A protein has these predicted regions:
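PLP-dependent enzyme catalytic core of the Aspartate aminotransferase-like
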Residues: 173, 327-328, 338-371
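Conserved PLP cofactor-binding pocket of PLP-dependent enzymes
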Residues: 14-16, 21, 304-306, 313, ...
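PLP-dependent aminotransferase-like
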Residues: 101-159
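PLP-dependent aminotransferase class I/II
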Residues: 43, 66, 215-293, 302-303
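Conserved PLP-binding catalytic core of the aspartate aminotransferase-like
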Residues: 281, 294-329
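Active-site pre-lysine segment of PLP-dependent enzymes
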Residues: 141-153, 165-186, 190-228, 241
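N-terminal "arm"/small-domain region of PLP-dependent enzymes with the aminotransferase-like
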Residues: 2-61, 152-153
Length: 371
């Protein structure tokens, strides 16, 4: 972003004047494995159902402001009443609204980096302080003891499970203890939960803790497992009183009619996505094993276990490798070398078998050449 003029600096709120916009560093390529999208084709029959729903949707009417048909379907899927679900324009809107409602000036967010950078960014937009409790620098596991020690002095907390970009899952007993230790709200971002186990995330989700902990919020998205990143649809599950807060502060009509129609059709066809998610998980393990073979053969490669649809990989001169993947092979991956604790790390989305083979073949050449 260009530097603001002096006049604009005087007009904008002082605490916002130096904030940089989120930049995913996107470049058009033949293979894009940089954004943790689901690159698989939409399951057979689902696209037709979505297209039919869109064709039947009038565009001259405002959408249902609460997306109630979609809420009902999501509630039925998760086994909760409608009053425990709120939809949003992607998970990002709900994440921002969480910080808007429960953060603010004089309050502090408990954050566990390396993690999704938008947590700290959105906190800065609503003047919320951030207390970072860093993950283990070698394993990237949560330092549960340190987090629980810091929690009483914080006003709200966010934990990602599986964590982006490291791929680890937060233990359920730890989440319960965090809800007890934190005096405010606790959000568990489960954007990648469907990839975490063989039950589409049902065995790993922290949703079952909501009955005991009314300060717990679970964040979901249709951008990952459902391959619907372009529709921008997310939702939260929480106690009805918490949902009332989300409903009160949300932007009116933030989930448009086309998104509601497409999302409803996709969620109704959720069983069709389970085989796709299972294949992504199998490919994740195959790619991880192939990278470990490179390491066993003496190449400077380190890869961590992951329960998401991505892998975090460390290699020599990662930024240069990423550039050569883009320029010589038309493959885009995400460079995290700029992030504290992630020196020489790339995050590689798990794609289709053909996409994965392409990136593995390229890395076998580039890692050796960049040693």
């Amino acid at each position: 972003m260009a530097e603001l003029s002096q006049k604009m600096k005087e007009l904008v709120q002082p605490y916002l004047a130096s904030i940089e916009p989120y930049d995913p560093n996107f470049t058009p390529t033949s293979i894009n494995l940089s954004a943790n999208e689901n690159t698989y084709p939409v399951p057979e029959g689902v696209r037709e159902a979505v297209d039919a729903a869109l064709a039947a949707t009038p565009l001259n009417r405002y959408p249902d402001p609460m997306s109630n048909d979609l809420r009902d379907e999501l509630a039925a899927w998760h086994g909760v009443p409608r009053e425990m679900v709120c939809t949003g324009n992607g998970g990002d809107e709900l994440l921002y609204n969480f910080l808007l409602a429960f953060g603010g000036r004089g309050r502090t967010l408990l954050n566990c980096p390396p993690c999704f950078s938008e947590y700290a960014f959105f906190a800065s937009l609503v003047e919320t302080g951030v207390r970072d409790v860093w993950r283990d620098p070698k394993t990237f596991e949560l330092d549960c003891a340190a987090v629980l020690e810091a929690a009483p002095s914080c006003d709200l907390a966010i934990v990602t499970s599986p964590n982006n970009p490291t791929g680890d899952v937060a233990p359920l007993d730890f989440i319960g203890k965090l809800c007890e230790a934190c005096p405010g709200m606790v959000m568990v971002d489960e954007a990648y939960i469907e990839f975490a186990d063989a039950s589409f995330g049902a065995k790993t989700t922290a949703q079952g803790l909501i009955e005991k902990y009314s300060n717990l919020v679970i964040l979901h998205t249709l951008s990952k497992a459902f391959g619907a990143a372009g529709t921008r649809c997310g939702y939260v599950i929480a106690a009805p009183e918490v949902i009332d807060v989300f409903a009160a502060i949300r932007q009116i009509y933030s989930v448009n009619v086309l998104t509601q129609a497409a999302a409803l059709a996709a969620v109704r066809a959720r069983d069709a996505y389970a085989p796709v998610v299972a294949q992504v998980a199998a490919e994740r393990e195959r790619v991880k094993a192939a990278l470990e073979v490179l390491a066993a053969n003496g190449l400077p490669v380190e890869v961590w276990p992951s329960f998401g649809n991505f892998l975090l990989v460390r290699m020599a001169h990662a930024t240069r490798v990423r550039e050569r993947l883009r320029d010589e092979y038309s493959i885009l991956v995400r460079d995290f070398s700029y992030a504290p604790g992630l020196a020489d790390c790339l995050r590689i989305t798990v794609g289709t078998p053909a996409e994965n083979d392409a990136v593995l073949s390229a890395l076998a050449v580039l890692v050796k050449e960049e040693m």
